Amino acid sequence: MKTLPAITQRAVKPCLSPVAVWQMLLTRLLEQHYGLTINDTPFCNEAVIKEHIDAGITLADAVNFLVEKYELVRIDRKGFSWQEQSPYLRAADILRARQATGLLRQSRNNVVR
């Protein structure tokens, strides 16, 4: 009779560094919302990203500073509205980017019904 090991080994995903996470999210957010690449910004330099992280600056604040400084306009909003549409990123935009890049995993065990 053949025995199987009691513990099954799972594929372990390497843990991404905070800089790598920022790079993934910045790439997605800048392209989708402003039509830019990360190379169009100071964030193409990993040291700049690390400085922001070390200073406690949030991703949203970092991008929104660029929006204000360069008067960026969002390209992902269609049509016109009677209200002026804000060019700034919101928490929901970052959440959607986390989902799209696979950085946000939903656990069915943690869902409260």
Curated annotation (Swiss-Prot):
Listed Pfam families: CbtA_toxin
Induction comment: Expressed in mid-log phase at lower levels than toxin relE.
Coiled coil stretches, renumbered: none
Outcome (variant: residue 65 to S): Loss of interaction with FtsZ
Phenotypic consequence of gene deletion: Deletion of 3 type IV toxin genes (cbtA, ykfI, ypfJ) leads to a slight reduction in resistance to oxidative stress, has no effect on cell growth.
InterPro entries: CbtA_toxin (IPR009610)
Gene Ontology terms: biological process: negative regulation of cell growth
The entry's keywords: Toxin-antitoxin system
Keyword Transferase: no
Family per record: Belongs to the CbtA/YkfI/YpjF toxin family.
Function: Toxic component of a type IV toxin-antitoxin (TA) system. Acts as a toxin inhibitor that blocks cell division and cell elongation via FtsZ and possibly also MreB (although no interaction with MreB has been proven). Overexpression results in inhibition of growth in liquid cultures and a decrease in colony formation. These effects are overcome by concomitant expression of cognate antitoxin YafW, which leads to toxin loss by an unknown mechanism.
Subunit structure: Interacts with FtsZ but not MreB.
Note, other: Encoded in prophage CP4-6.
Protein name stated in the entry: Toxin YkfI
Record lineage: Bacteria, Pseudomonadati, Pseudomonadota, Gammaproteobacteria, Enterobacterales
